[in-house]
């Protein structure tokens, strides 16, 4: 497999990955575009695209409301719905194409196949959960969850780091591995003409499986986020 790198730009001491930035913005635009396209001109008798959008929304609500709580669901339903769609689109973008320059620069990838993105995104989601916990319970009620019972305080603090790490590493491992194998199959197809039909069929099968796994990972990421959010806004329930 040929080695490829993403083009970067340095602004002061900070290095920006241009491919990652572009693909993240593309994910935002695609997610917004899909929702806008499916929701414009909504009618009492829904069209197929409106039905699809409502089905996804109801699906997200159904598997997260038990964690967040029905009394809070109306406050966080759009957040969780947007999160699910964003992660699903981000996971699948890299499967749509492979764009690479002659000098080895990679111009197309799933944002979630990058560990730095996954760590940053998971940190953002984790901070959101903590902020909402403080807003709903107050600082006293929020801190009580860490020190009750007192002997479990170190484990409660450690759990916050493991929750954050599990969000990032789980999605990174699955999406990165999927792109690597897809790249290997494409490389194999270019080795010799007689390998092309076999590699093409295997790549089609693997792409279909990867789309399924990508959607499962979006489901898992949203489910875990709703669990962490529910614990923070409702307090620890024994």
From Swiss-Prot:
Localization per Swiss-Prot or TrEMBL: Cell membrane
Keyword annotations from UniProtKB, A to Z: ATP synthesis, Cell membrane, CF(0), Hydrogen ion transport, Ion transport, Membrane, Transmembrane, Transmembrane helix, Transport
Pfam families assigned: ATP-synt_A
Leader peptide range in chain numbering: none
Protein topology in the membrane: Multi-pass membrane protein
UniProt keyword Ion transport present: yes
Domain of life: Bacteria
Gene Ontology cellular component annotations, sorted alphabetically: plasma membrane; proton-transporting ATP synthase complex
InterPro entries, sorted: ATP_syn_F0_a_bact/chloroplast, ATP_synth_F0_asu, F0_ATP_A_sf
Transmembrane segments: 18-38, 77-97, 114-134, 167-187, 193-213
GO terms for MF: proton-transporting ATP synthase activity, rotational mechanism
Any one GO biological process: proton motive force-driven plasma membrane ATP synthesis
Function description: Key component of the proton channel; it plays a direct role in the translocation of protons across the membrane.
Record note on quaternary structure: F-type ATPases have 2 components, CF(1) - the catalytic core - and CF(0) - the membrane proton channel. CF(1) has five subunits: alpha(3), beta(3), gamma(1), delta(1), epsilon(1). CF(0) has three main subunits: a(1), b(2) and c(9-12). The alpha and beta chains form an alternating ring which encloses part of the gamma chain. CF(1) is attached to CF(0) by a central stalk formed by the gamma and epsilon chains, while a peripheral stalk is formed by the delta and b chains.
HAMAP family hit by this protein: ATP_synth_a_bact
Family membership noted in the UniProt record: Belongs to the ATPase A chain family.
Protein name: ATP synthase subunit a
Organism: Streptococcus sanguinis (strain SK36)
Gene this protein is translated from: atpB
